[in-house]
């Protein structure tokens, strides 16, 4: 055996393996950077919407498809930009991190604008006015917000209802991934009350005959579309589309489609009074 040739061959193999590992390492680093910057796996022809599809009538599953007011709104935005809309369904509390990492372009998920959220994202002009409501089982001794002290309260994780419940003295707050899951827990007696946005509360409690929504609002809020902090170009485009939709009637058509004619009339009346 020629030992010199063997050594050279061994050196060549080792050098080749080392080079391969180096290239793989560089590739992994580039992949990570591109993902964080939102530049990997995303085409210029695609607009990625992040949402939490358990919030009817804004976003919910119909068979294998995610539909709702927010979805139709996002489709109009994508169409105006000559882009295809892609929807990423995820937990509500994961939306802003996904926005920051570049996994999604915008979060359209019935998201209320709050000072805390505004620290981590840009927000479009408001597209819907909402409020938080209390839901209880019929016959419950809880009749108003003041009687929530020390009670077991169910909320959807990461929502403004979650924040409100956390401020109630002595409250034992249980967090759930979706609106239907927290109402199911209330119906089963696992919690004594639920704090939830008004429109989903009305939609989902219709399927629970033993539940009722108490009169009175816990808060007044505005939904808006969240965009990554430095993406002012996309923010400007979204605001322009929202303004055009409100002007040409497309926005009213979506309200009528998802909430009914009576809701549209009520909304118009409130606008005139304000």
Residue spans for each PLM region:
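Extended ligand-binding regions for polar small-molecule ligands
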Residues: 32-33, 71-80, 146-147, 152, ...
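Periplasmic-binding protein-like
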Residues: 53, 128-136, 198, 202-243, ...
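Acidic, polar ligand-binding/catalytic clefts
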Residues: 75, 79, 84-147, 212-217
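A ligand-binding cleft/hinge motif common to bilobed small-molecule-binding domains
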Residues: 97, 111-119, 164, 187-188, ...
């Amino acid at each position: 055996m020629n030992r010199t040739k063997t050594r050279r061959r061994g050196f060549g193999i080792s050098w080749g393996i080392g080079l391969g590992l180096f290239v793989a390492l560089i590739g992994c680093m580039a992949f990570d950077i591109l993902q964080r910057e939102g530049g990997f796996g995303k085409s210029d022809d695609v607009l990625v919407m992040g949402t939490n599809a358990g919030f009817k009538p804004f976003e919910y599953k119909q068979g294998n498809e995610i539909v709702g007011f927010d979805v139709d709104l996002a489709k109009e935005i994508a169409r105006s930009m000559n882009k295809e809309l892609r929807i990423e369904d995820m937990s509500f509390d994961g939306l802003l991190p996904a926005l920051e990492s570049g996994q999604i372009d915008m979060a359209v998920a019935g998201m209320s604008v709050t000072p805390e959220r505004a620290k981590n994202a840009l927000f479009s002009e408001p597209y819907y006015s909402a409020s938080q409501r209390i839901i209880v089982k019929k016959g419950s001794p809880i009749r108003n917000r003041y009687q929530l002290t020390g009670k077991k309260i169910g909320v959807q994780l990461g929502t403004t209802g979650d924040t409100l419940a956390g401020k109630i003295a002595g409250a034992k707050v249980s967090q759930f991934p979706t609106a239907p899951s927290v109402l199911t827990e209330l119906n089963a007696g696992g919690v004594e009350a639920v704090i939830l946005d008004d429109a989903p509360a009305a939609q989902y409690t219709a399927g629970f005959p033993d539940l009722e929504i108490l009169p009175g609002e816990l808060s007044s809020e505005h939904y808006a579309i969240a965009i990554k902090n430095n993406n002012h170009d996309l923010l400007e485009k979204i605001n322009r589309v929202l303004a055009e939709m409100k002007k040409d009637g497309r926005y009213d058509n979506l309200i009528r489609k998802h909430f009914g004619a009576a809701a549209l009339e009520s909304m118009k009346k409130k606008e005139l009074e304000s």
